[in-house]
């Protein structure tokens, strides 16, 4: 009878217990490799051939960063103007040196007929320049009268504006009245320039002031008559203008 210990000669003892064995993915892969069989996983998808549309040429040109807008559209659009078509800056501001020169010549020559279309414009470039020049010449003569010059100019324009609206059939704007009275202030600037070099408090100064007042009032009334079509009323318009320019003459002489 064979001895049972005879069968234990070729074995060694270990702590491995067959009941504690758990299936693992490595073991399944190992057995799969051995037997040439592998179970398909749930995440794997059967590969499908690419659709033939992917190999067709696309209409997209490959211009990634080019804006979608068309420059030809903006260049042909009538709402977009180029710099060549824009008016000059002086024209946009309403400054016309040709008209300023014509108005100045009209004031300097009281006998010259005035152009009503030009004189009816609201141009304040020349009047502001002449008001500043009058104040500067008075300052050079030792008379700081800027406040009086600007104050009497504003009040005088309001009075003449109200008077002309009552006398004329067609109304006149305040800017037009201020423009005409300001341009006709040029002879008064010449009188104040003479006061810088010699005193006007005498017979010569008084006669010069009366001449300048007549000059300014006749020029202003001539322009108003031409612009407002008030024939035969020049003396009625010249009288209030003479009162206004008389105040400026008093500032200049005294």
Swiss-Prot record:
Membrane topology: Multi-pass membrane protein
Subcellular location per the Swiss-Prot or TrEMBL entry: Endoplasmic reticulum membrane; Golgi apparatus, cis-Golgi network membrane; Golgi apparatus, trans-Golgi network membrane
Main location: endoplasmic reticulum
GO cellular component, one term: endoplasmic reticulum membrane
Tissue specificity note: Specifically expressed in the heart.
Cysteine disulfide partners in this protein: none
Sequence ranges on the Lumenal membrane side: 145, 201-209
Keyword vocabulary terms for this entry: Endoplasmic reticulum, Golgi apparatus, Membrane, Transmembrane, Transmembrane helix
GO biological process, one term: Golgi organization
Spans through the membrane: 124-144, 146-166, 180-200, 210-230, 234-254
InterPro entries (UniProt xref): Yip1/4-like, Yip1_dom
Cytoplasmic membrane side: 1-123, 167-179, 231-233
Family to which this protein belongs: Belongs to the YIP1 family.
Protein name per its UniProtKB record: Protein YIPF7
Lineage start: Eukaryota, Metazoa, Chordata, Craniata, Vertebrata
Gene: Yipf7
């Amino acid at each position: 009878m064979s001895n049972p210990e005879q069968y234990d000669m070729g074995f060694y003892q270990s702590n491995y217990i067959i009941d504690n064995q758990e299936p693992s993915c490595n073991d399944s892969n190992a057995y799969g490799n051995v037997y040439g069989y592998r179970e398909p996983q749930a995440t794997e998808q059967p590969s499908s051939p690419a659709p033939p549309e992917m190999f067709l040429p696309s209409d997209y040109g490959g211009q990634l960063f080019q804006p979608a807008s068309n420059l030809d559209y903006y260049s042909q659009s009538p709402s977009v103007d180029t710099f060549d078509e824009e008016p000059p800056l002086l024209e946009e501001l309403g400054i016309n040196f040709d008209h300023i020169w014509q108005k100045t010549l009209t004031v300097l020559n009281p006998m010259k007929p005035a152009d009503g279309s030009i004189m009816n414009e609201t141009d304040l470039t020349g009047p502001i320049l002449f008001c500043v020049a009058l104040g500067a010449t008075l300052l050079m003569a030792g008379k700081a009268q800027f406040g009086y010059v600007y104050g009497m100019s504003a009040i005088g324009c309001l009075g003449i504006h109200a008077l002309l609206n009552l006398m004329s059939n067609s109304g006149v704007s305040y800017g037009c009245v201020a423009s005409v009275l300001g341009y006709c202030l040029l002879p008064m600037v010449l009188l104040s320039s003479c006061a810088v070099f010699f005193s006007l408090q005498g017979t010569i100064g008084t006669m010069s002031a009366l001449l300048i007042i007549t000059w300014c009032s006749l020029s202003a009334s001539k322009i108003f008559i031409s612009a407002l079509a008030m024939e035969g009323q020049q003396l009625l318009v010249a009288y209030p203008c003479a009162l206004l320019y008389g105040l400026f003459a008093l500032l200049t002489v005294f």
